[in-house]
Each structure stands twice: as structure tokens, then as C-alpha cells.
């Protein structure tokens, strides 16, 4: 969950970071490698068929290490079949710790865990890996920096290793290099029942899910086409040690099961084993891809999980490109249909709501958002496309999208409304109260979020008698 600004600071500061400076030099992994293959100062180039590159560093204490850089791969684009990504295998002192999937020729800020290292000298080795698309020939890593952040040490220590999906539906051990790739991870903490103990929960954003919620419902109910799941939760004591028997993970069918698998240090090994990115704690033999994402970031209180994507804007582009490549986008886009159109035609909105007590029997109410345009205020564009099950019945900060005619801008909007409706048969009469719009934006021509232009705070209660209310006007 690093912002672009923070990535820039990390890259510039290089070795003097987090109170644990590291000495860094880029060099060939083999003495015979040509010097120029290291690129310009502060740049490492990893070539298909070329030698591995190495990055020596010195750790001034024991602890968890993280590597950051901006990554690009000429000729690569997640939107094109045969050019989806380049893959770099990353090892520390000869031990494979993580892989990097590079889905773009444009530089993307990335941060990956390297696992626990001891005090002293170490070497990061980077190799161009199998699973790279045919169009990929080189990966460029600019301003690589290894750091050992003390403030985030506990979260990094217990972060899970996500082993890539290898089996059904594709039977391809490298499938996460072309579909449902892990993009970003973060953690959240809360007090445990035992004084001084904490519970740490880890979540991951994937580029999509090949199963589970269908794409139109994802946009309506979750405000995105990525998949976001919690994957691992554990209790730690006051010294940061794992409390035996407390580790659980999100298993197939969204079950919460005890983790009984293998650890690398304190890092549990979990494998993505379903089409909708649920986990198994037993891995397939010799899986080629593994992801130790930097999970040091967390989510602000009172914000939806999608704020993680907002802080990594490139994730919106990758999500949109996967939809285009997998032919999940209708053409031309039409807000009158339920099918997902060009994601640049959607208003991406986060709002907060609560549901009151039921007064009768029947289904719980959900809330959708509606948008009216200045050009025709009589027409209402709904986030749920008038599908009852696509309104949002969960409480707290939530995200949705509203599909609008191509070319619509925020300046064209006459108003945004909250719309209460039961999600099934009958209506239990519970009121729904909306208290904020936290952000609203369109994607630009490059599928990157524009600055938020829609915010509102207040309190509007929706009832059976008064099921709609205007939240925002320009």
C-alpha cells in the first residue's frame, strides 16, 4: 500500500532507510557477465537468455528485508495475448523467495518481501524466468533499494507466501503470469482477548478472479473487477511470537480453517488453489511461482478495502486490461445493459452506510447509488442496474460503480442519489443511513484514476416510505 510519493522517496534514499542502512551495488551474478548489462547507475536490466543479475547488500541487524524498485518490461502489455508479462525470479543467498510479474512497459512502483536475513552480507539474485510472455525480452528495475523497516517488522515477519495457482482451470503452473495475478498485499491488526496480544490479518488484491462473483456484479457490489480476499490471520504475543493454534486461513468455499501447513521462519506457505483465489495450506509439488508481497501497509479506519487500490493507481489499469484481453467487456459500451462496458465510462464511488433494526420480516435492504446528468435529469443511471441482489447490504465503507454514457465527466453530473431497495423477497423494514461519499472519480484515457472530484458528508436515512435521497450536487 505504498503511494507513488513514498516509492519515490524510498528509491532516492537508497541505502539509508528505516534506521538500518544497507550497502547496495548492482553487479552480474557471474564474473563473466558484461558490465553494461547492469544498465545505467541505479538500474538493473534482466534479459531473456542472459545472465542473472545480483544485488549485494549488508544487513546491520537480523530481521525482515524488503526490496523496492520501479519495474518495466519493453514490449509487454497486460492487455495483449502473448505479451501479458515478464517474470523475474528473485532469490536471496541462492534461496528462491519470491517472483515478480511485470505487466507493463510503463514503470510501476513495486515492493516485495525478501524474508528474514541475518546480520551481515547477502546477495539478491534476479533471473529472467520461465512463464514470461513470448513478447517479453527484458525487465528494467530502476533505483532498487533493500531496506529493513523496524516499524513494520512484525507485519513483515508473519506475512504469508502466496504460491501461484498451478492446476484447474488451466493446468498451467505459470497461469498467474497471465491471469488473476497477485498485485498488492496489506495487513490489519486488532487487540486479541489476551492482554498484550494482537491479531494480524493479511489480505491480497488479485487482478481478477476466474470464478466466483461474475464481472457485472463485481462492479455493482464491490466497485472493481479485481478480487480482494483476506487470506491469513494469526495471533501474536507481546514479543511478536506466533501463538500456537491460532493461525487460520481462507479456504475453498470461503471457509475459515486452521492452518496446518509449512512455515518458512514465521511465513506460512499458502497456495492459491481455486478459481476465486481461495487458499490451500498444502502446496502442489515444485510450484514455479511464489509471491511474498510487501504487506507492511495497512488500511485507514473508516475506509473501504478499495482504498488499497486507490493508493496503487496502476492496479486499476491492470484490472481493466485483463477484462479487455479476456473479452469480458461489451463493445460498444451501453449503460442500459447489465454487461460491463469500458471501465473509463464508470464513476467509481466509495460511500459509507449503516443498516438499522428490522421492523418486520422479509429481506434486508441494500443501497445502490443513482446518477442523473444535466443533459437529461429525468434519466437515472443506477449502480445496481435495477438488479435487487446487486445493491449493497453490507455496512461500513463500501465501493460501487455507476456506468454512464461514454465521454461523461464529473462536470456533466447533476446529482448523485442513494437508493434503498430490498435485496430479495419482501422487505424487513430496516432503515439504511448513508453518512458520506468518500471519493468519486473516473479513469483517464490510460485507465488510471483521475483525482477524486466527489465528496460529501452528512446523514440521510432511507426508509420504505422514503427510499431515495440526493447526496451530492455540484
Regions picked out by a protein language model, each given a short descriptive name:
Residues 1-33:
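Secretory targeting and sorting signals
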Residues 32-62, 75-82, 135-140, 304-340, ...:
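Glycan-recognition and processing domains
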Residues 41-43, 48-52, 70-146, 376-415, ...:
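Beta-strand-rich ligand-recognition modules
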Residues 53-55, 61-67, 198, 343-347:
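Structural beta-strand segments of beta-rich domains
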Residues 65, 88, 122, 198-200, ...:
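Residue-level detector of short, conserved catalytic/binding motifs and their immediate flanks
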Residues 78-88, 139-140, 223-229, 342, ...:
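Short coil-to-beta strand junction motifs in C2/discoidin
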Residues 96, 111-116, 137-229, 241-342, ...:
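A domain-level signal for the mature, folded cores of soluble proteins
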Residues 368, 374-474:
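Extended, charged low-complexity segments
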